[in-house]
């Protein structure tokens, strides 16, 4: 059943009155309303706010929470409807409620004549302002929607998903509604008066008259309560509430209304996250470094060889200082002593805040005599005496806080560059002393040999060391892991080191170097193609200094300590056996 009302508008009492204007043509607007007859449905009722009834105007009404159930084209049609004039676009708008389940339905067509008035210029073609006197239409959705129609679903405010999460507004009083017992939707109308103090904010009825959607969004944001953190609901109450969209204007759907709900409150005093798994074990290295820099280091080096092999010069070149005995205590005439004299001199060297107490031990007269029998004994006695001194400091009841370390850490043995092989004196000395000290053999004045002679000479010395069982530093048995083994193998291949010493500086290609200048060129001491002094310096100072000290303390000194304690215990046992037991006194 279809009813048509043409040329009239429904008033507040339910009657239709005809609108006419002689000044302009009448525009006809049609609304198709589908009425569904349900046996349990209740007639729609109008609830007016009693607090606002006195100031209600006949032309100010608002449909609250109109959900656009269609997709983007429907929203664009509504947006264009609010922005265009009646002459430019007159389309058919269908207002419908939730779809009923009964197949039998009635369609009521309500036609409203809208009088058009020209503003400011009657002859100009432009947008015209028009007003709806009464636009109260409640309908239902047709079974088959047209593709060009805009469907507006009217639901209860309590069924909206957004309204269920929002508290009641503070500015607009809450509309008292009775609980719904059936599935039929109820229409709730709130009539809002136009505020006198804010003329720029239009009423809900004026949103259909104004072509600009900005006041609609401002009024919508005023009427809506302030967003608060949402309370999640497990199940929606109705299908229409889950599919509801913002109503009236398309830009309201594009603007996020509850942006404040998505943004979490930022903490002002937020601190950086703390790694609770960090313990701080790596700080022990810094602690050891500070302690070592306060205490300093000690390094004792001995040089052994015949006179004139450049022992003092090489020591000065190693540390780039005048630290040798001859440099510190020069003598006008120095004769070869009849017996080997052990002379040592100590220097305090500081570099980049690191202090080191360096002791250089010289052995003048070694191998300079005709009869060199047992010439190694004074040197071995000196080394053992330093071990004994350190041992006595350890066994004392009241030990010192820090025992002075005078033990010989390394012994540089100078081999003359004969080009043949090791002498019997060299073999005997290194065989005996390799068990009590770290021996590093070097070829003195290697610049007197050609490159081919140097290679053959080194091969012969290596063969002699292996045949006589002489173990020089770095020893294979003291390699801790594969990494140390790889590094030490490179040094073992270079033994004995062919070195050249010089304490004179020269300018070569704008660079200062240590070397020896001859008629045919300059020998650079630190150039690895000229000699192997740089490798010797790395072994003694830059890479293996601490390892040399550790082997001296844990291997050589421990062997001497065990031997001395065994001798002391055996001597004490022999003394106790010789004594007769005495009778105890009363």
UniProtKB/Swiss-Prot annotation:
What keywords are assigned to this protein? Answer: Acetylation, Cell cycle, Cell division, Chromosomal rearrangement, Cytoplasm, Cytoskeleton, Disease variant, GTP-binding, Nucleotide-binding, Phosphoprotein
Tell me the GO molecular function terms: cadherin binding; GTP binding; GTPase activity; molecular adaptor activity
Chain positions covered by the region annotation G1 motif:
305-312
Indicate, by first and last residue, each region the UniProt record lists as having compositional bias (Low complexity).
1-14
Q: Where is this region: G3 motif?
A: 362-365
Phosphothreonine modifications at:
38, 42, 49, 142
Keyword presence, Cytoplasm: yes
Tell me the ranges covered by the Septin-type G domain, including all copies: 295-567
* Keyword Acetylation (UniProt): yes
PROSITE patterns (UniProt xref): G_SEPTIN (PS51719)
Region of interest: G4 motif:
444-447
Basic and acidic residues bias spans: 134-151
**Residues the record lists as Phosphoserine modifications:** 22, 30, 82, 85, 89, 96, 327, 332
Q: Where is the region Disordered?
A: 1-49, 62-108, 134-268
Q: Which GO terms describe its biological process?
A: actin cytoskeleton organization; cytoskeleton-dependent cytokinesis; positive regulation of non-motile cilium assembly; protein localization; septin cytoskeleton organization
Write down the PANTHER family for this protein, in alphabetical order.
SEPTIN
The job of this chain, per UniProt, is described as: Filament-forming cytoskeletal GTPase. May play a role in cytokinesis (Potential). May play a role in the internalization of 2 intracellular microbial pathogens, Listeria monocytogenes and Shigella flexneri.
Disease annotated for this entry: A chromosomal aberration involving SEPTIN9/MSF is found in therapy-related acute myeloid leukemia (t-AML). Translocation t(11;17)(q23;q25) with KMT2A/MLL1. Hereditary neuralgic amyotrophy: Autosomal dominant form of recurrent focal neuropathy characterized clinically by acute, recurrent episodes of brachial plexus neuropathy with muscle weakness and atrophy preceded by severe pain in the affected arm. HNA is triggered by environmental factors such as infection or parturition.
Which family is this sequence assigned to?
Belongs to the TRAFAC class TrmE-Era-EngA-EngB-Septin-like GTPase superfamily. Septin GTPase family.
- Which protein, by its recorded name, is this? Septin-9
**What organism does this protein naturally occur in?**
Homo sapiens (Human)
What is the name of the gene encoding this protein? SEPTIN9
